[in-house]
């Protein structure tokens, strides 16, 4: 069973770190995204979730018609700051869905850094914070890896991060320089991406 990669509107952005120089972001999915993908891909009656150990663990099972049995994958979650039991149940469910491959491509995200000029920073207790909201404006994949990503600051109403390449970029390039040179460019982008990961 393989699941499609997530669309831009299904991916959330979370602020990871904040300093006077800017903020770093992480990409994540919520439990509703997982439920929607499961419903869409295999049907709402062909999967189920169970929680054990006081919601610490979640088992997501998918019906295998060829074997006439449920196939299950399990993972554990962590508590949220606001709602302990609900947050833990949601987190364990999302992690179990990662085990099935839903949203696993998010692990290939580049390091997302937003400069201070593109975010509203607020001094607080000798540190900085921000209440800006960020969204994934566009995303592209190749071989289950993120190769293109654009992030929008909804408060400033502009694109504040751009990485890699997109299908329309390739189409435009192919008309100008030919497919052979495009393939070389793709390899170079991938080489730089791997080098960045090793550096980080």
Question: Where do the PLM segments sit?
Answer:
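Interfaces that engage single-stranded nucleic acids at replication/repair/recombination sites
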Residues: 1-19, 23, 113-200
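Strand-helix-loop interaction patch of compact alpha/beta domains
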Residues: 2-50
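Positively charged, aromatic-enriched nucleic acid-contacting surfaces
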Residues: 31-166
């Amino acid at each position: 069973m393989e699941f499609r990669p997530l669309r831009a509107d299904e991916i959330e952005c979370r602020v990871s770190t904040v300093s006077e120089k800017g903020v770093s972001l992480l990409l994540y999915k919520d439990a509703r995204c997982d439920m929607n993908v499961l419903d869409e891909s295999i049907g709402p009656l062909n999967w189920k979730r169970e929680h054990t150990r006081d919601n610490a663990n979640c088992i997501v099972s998918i019906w295998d018609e060829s074997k006439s049995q449920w196939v299950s994958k399990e993972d554990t979650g962590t508590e949220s700051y606001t709602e302990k039991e609900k947050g833990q149940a949601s987190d364990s469910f999302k992690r179990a869905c990662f085990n099935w491959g839903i949203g696993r491509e998010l692990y290939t995200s580049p390091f997302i850094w937003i400069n201070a000029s593109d975010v509203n920073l607020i001094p607080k207790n000798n540190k900085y914070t921000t209440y800006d909201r960020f969204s994934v404006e566009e995303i592209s994949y190749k071989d289950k890896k993120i190769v293109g990503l654009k992030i929008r600051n909804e408060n400033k109403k502009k694109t504040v991060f751009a990485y890699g390449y997109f299908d329309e970029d390739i189409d435009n390039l192919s008309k100008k320089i030919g497919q052979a040179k495009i393939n070389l460019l793709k390899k170079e982008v991938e080489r730089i991406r791997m080098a960045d990961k090793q550096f980080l």
